[in-house]
Structures are given as C-alpha cells and as structure tokens.
Design a protein with these regions (language model features):
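Structured, contiguous alpha/beta core segments that scaffold functional sites
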Residues: 1-252
Length: 252
C-alpha cells in the first residue's frame, strides 16, 4: 500500500544577493533586487550586538576628529560643518564598506564651494567607460520605488567642473570578487547577524502568542484529495515558516 505522505517545507534560508548586475538603464544593480545596501541598514537597525559594534567602531574610526592646519581650510571646514559630515561617512564606511561625498563647485568653477555627506545606499554606479573607469553614478532617494527618478552625478574630477558643477567622491576600498561596490568587513558574518535578528523575532512572537507551541495535526478520518492536501500544505508553509511563525496554534 502506497503511503500518502506530504513534505512540508518550513523554510530554507537564502542569503541576500550582493551580485553586481547590469540593468537595462545602464547602471549596476547592487544585488539581484538592487537593495543590498538597504538590507545592510536593516540588519544594523535590528540586531542589537551588530548595532553596538557598528556604532562604537564608527566612533573609533572618527577618533578625535579632523581639522586642517591652514586657516583658510579650517574656516571652510567649519563653515561646511565637516565634522558632522565625516561622522556620517564613518558610519557609512562601517555599515557599507564605503562612503560618498557630494562636491559642489563655486560659480566660477575655480574652487570647491561646499562638501557634504551623501547617503551611500542611495548611489548606484553606471557602467565603466573604455578606460574601465566609472564616470557617473545614479542617485535615488528610494531605489525600492521605481516611480522615483534617479539623477546622474558625475564622479569627482576638477577637469569637468564647468560641465558638472555637482560631483560625487565615491570612496570604496578593494573588495575581492567585486568591481563596482565595496563589501563591509563583516560580510562573512551576515548569517550570524541575521540569526540574532530572527531569534529576537521568534521569541517576541512566542511571547505575543502566550508561549503556546507550534504543532502539526494528523488527519485520522482518511486522506483528503490531492487538491485539498496541497491547499493545506500551502497554508501551513505560509503561516508557520520562519521566525514569524513562532507560537502559532492550528485548530481543525
């Protein structure tokens, strides 16, 4: 007699893609969904140990701060509030593995008028030119929303100050296996950072559900038709997979 057994897939972890993929618009997607930087920020905001480490290490990177020696540079540094801008860069550097600065040239294009921090997660590289150099970046305040138009920003180059008075200085260390984007130094620990987040979600859901255990039910009144079994299996998988399924009770 053939046993009627159904396999219930209660979830398999898939690592977030950080692949560099050429889009139809000519820029390089960061991850298969183009949201890997946003994923890193999500981990920073949801894993307490990771949050504490990133915050403290970013403070150590900043150290005692920065201050130019000559008077003119010091005045510009203070007027641009560069201390605060560089603090933000240090946080980006720790979370993302790189940082970016917006450079604005003066009206006569002879000097730099302002320097400010650009959120690293909002920038995407355009394809390299014949010299294998990135000359432009795309900036969008919300890459998850295709209705938000991305604007072009030229990479920092004083030779093109007249044509492009607003430029971006994109700083990224060498990352093995990557060309356009850096990787954070904790890239090998992402599973463990995510694990801490999921453990917290699992336990808080258990608390909200009165610490009641999740369990399965065996049908004693015969085997349902295949369509009904598939519907039951899909419902169980959707409701009980992952940390959000903790403590849920099924009644039949």
């Amino acid at each position: 007699m053939k046993a009627n057994l159904e396999h219930i897939a209660l979830g398999t972890h898939q690592m977030k893609s950080s692949d560099e993929v050429v889009s139809n618009e000519g820029f390089i997607q960061y991850g298969s969904d183009n949201l890997f930087p946003q994923y890193l920020i999500g981990l920073y905001q949801s894993s307490p140990t990771h949050t504490a480490l990133v915050t403290s290490i970013a403070q150590m990177v900043y150290g005692d701060g920065f201050m130019p020696h000559d008077l003119d540079s010091r005045l510009a540094f203070l007027s641009w509030d560069m201390a605060d801008q560089l603090r933000k860069c240090c946080v980006d550097y720790k979370i993302q593995g790189g940082y970016a600065l917006e450079i604005e040239w003066s009206l006569d294009r002879s000097t730099i008028a302002n320097v400010s921090h650009l959120p690293f997660e909002n920038l995407r590289a355009c394809e390299v030119n014949d010299e294998e150099k990135v000359t432009h970046y795309k900036y969008s305040a919300n890459w998850a929303d295709s209705a938000v138009e991305a604007i072009d920003i030229h990479t920092f180059n004083p030779k093109y100050a007249k044509e492009f008075p607003t430029q971006v200085l994109y700083v990224k260390p060498f990352s093995p296996g990557s060309f356009y984007y850096p990787k954070p130094d904790y890239i090998g620990a992402l599973n463990y950072v995510e694990l801490e987040r999921e453990i917290g979600i699992y336990h808080i859901n258990n608390i909200h559900n009165g610490l009641s255990p999740s369990f399965s039910i065996h049908f004693k009144n015969g085997v349902p038709p295949i369509e009904e079994r598939n519907a039951i299996r899909n419902e169980i998988e959707s409701q009980m997979t992952g940390s959000k399924g903790a403590g849920k009770v099924w009644i039949t």
